[in-house]
Curated annotation (Swiss-Prot):
Protein's name according to its UniProt entry: tRNA pseudouridine synthase A
Residues that coordinate or bind substrate: 110
Family from the record: Belongs to the tRNA pseudouridine synthase TruA family.
The keyword tRNA processing is assigned to this record: yes
Subunit composition and interactions: Homodimer.
EC number: 5.4.99.12
Keyword tRNA processing part of the UniProt annotation: yes
């Protein structure tokens, strides 16, 4: 039995999320079905983590265990014939048997895209159509509130036994086409954490939320008390980095 690390990219608008759900189109379900069909036995796909309905991935990672010698390039081509066009396996590489796609993650990078310009019907599944200008310098200043090791339970839509997470860096760029790109670097993220932080930053920017409110969310952590959440369509899992 050999273990392989895979990288998959997908358009989340065509799926009900990563995790398998009965009678629903999910990325994990599609991959397991396709690998099992080609290999000829039940194959379990373990991802680096879950993405919600509508969330996209540029480089989501997973591992699979496969018996015998295989031609990786041929396997990738066969898999992609079954899962395209909205999901594509980019690479498969042999790794140590002890490797785990979820438990050995060092850093995850998420991007969130906001269109501050005119509404664009071609982008509705891929960016938050805010249709409102944002103060970039204020965005950057307010983003520092979320840096460091903190209890982010208020910024999660699920109960967690350990809601302490570390966000090491947040970068914010405005591009010429009125697109604002927020990039989050962290060791891991709670469910909906990035989307809730983005919504807070936008509300702070548009004077719909006070800085004191954010402080209270950290002082009195409670699941989902942040309330506001940016649309899933603007969120992308960009990179997953592992310990060497």
């Amino acid at each position: 039995m050999a273990r392989y690390l895979g990288i998959v990219s997908y358009d989340g608008s065509y799926f009900k999320g990563w995790a398998i759900q009965p009678n629903l189109a999910t990325i994990q379900g599609l991959l397991e079905q396709s690998f099992s069909l080609i290999i000829g036995r039940k194959i379990k796909v373990i991802g680096s983590g879950r993405t919600d309905k509508g969330v996209h991935a540029i480089n989501q990672t997973f591992h699979v265990d496969i018996n015998g010698e295989i031609n990786l390039n041929l396997l990738i081509r066969k898999i992609n014939q079954l899962i395209k066009p909205h999901c594509i396996v980019k690479t498969l590489v042999l790794v140590n048997d002890s490797f785990h796609a979820r438990f050995q993650v060092k850093t995850k990078v998420y991007e969130y895209l906001i269109n501050c310009g005119n509404l664009n019907p071609l982008q509705f599944n891929y960016v938050w159509q805010l249709n409102q200008q944002l103060d970039l310098e204020k965005l950057k200043a307010d983003a520092t509130l979320f840096l460091g090791k903190k209890n982010f339970l208020s910024f999660s839509s699920s109960i967690h036994t350990d809601s302490i997470r570390t966000i090491s860096k947040i970068t914010i760029q405005k591009e010429t086409n009125q697109l604002v790109r927020l990039t989050f670097f962290g060791s891991g993220f709670l469910r909906s954490q990035v989307r809730m932080i983005v919504a807070c930053l936008v509300n702070l920017n548009t004077n719909k939320m006070a800085l004191e409110t954010v402080a209270k969310l950290f002082e009195h952590p409670k699941k989902g008390s942040c309330v506001v959440k940016a649309p899933s369509c603007g969120l992308y899992l960009k990179t997953v980095v592992y310990e060497k």
